Amino acid sequence: PAGSTFGEYPLEVNTGNLNPDYKTVLVLKLKSSSPGSTIGAQYDTLKITFVGCLSLLDGNYSVAITSAGLTAVRTNEVVTLTDINTFRTRYVGRYTLGTFSPAGYTFIDICDEISLPKNQTLGGYSNKVYGTSFYGDGIDGIVTSETTFEVVHNIAFADGDQKQTYLYTRL
């Protein structure tokens, strides 16, 4: 219907032959079947990611956070599982605990490729926290071993966005 921002489409996928160790992406290009109706450009591509690998990144870490040429090391970082393969950190940027509420930032790990969901802000402020695709298209971080992972994202400020680089090491 006019003005709608979503629609329904039944889709059955037999996942039996998908690789359980790597993500499989199904890309659908949407077109209207009703005369006179259109699909906005921002909605014309639908990506569905099938994941066989469950992420185990939740836990306690030491993290080195670098931005604006300075590095802060936090030895009490806690990465919390909030949903399937979705996590929330305790720290964002080099800021101390309690600076923002909610604290930290959210990321998703799909088969050792980390991405930041859109529309994150710095605590209750309007500053956007967003991915940079530093490691490839849509990839804002990588899991480098069973005990380490890296993330790069930006925080938007009025005087210019600031790159944040994190190196997490499991304790």
Residue ranges and their predicted role:
Residues 7-32:
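Contiguous beta-strand segments of beta-sheet-rich domains
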Residues 1-6:
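Short proline/glycine- and polar residue-rich coil/turn motifs
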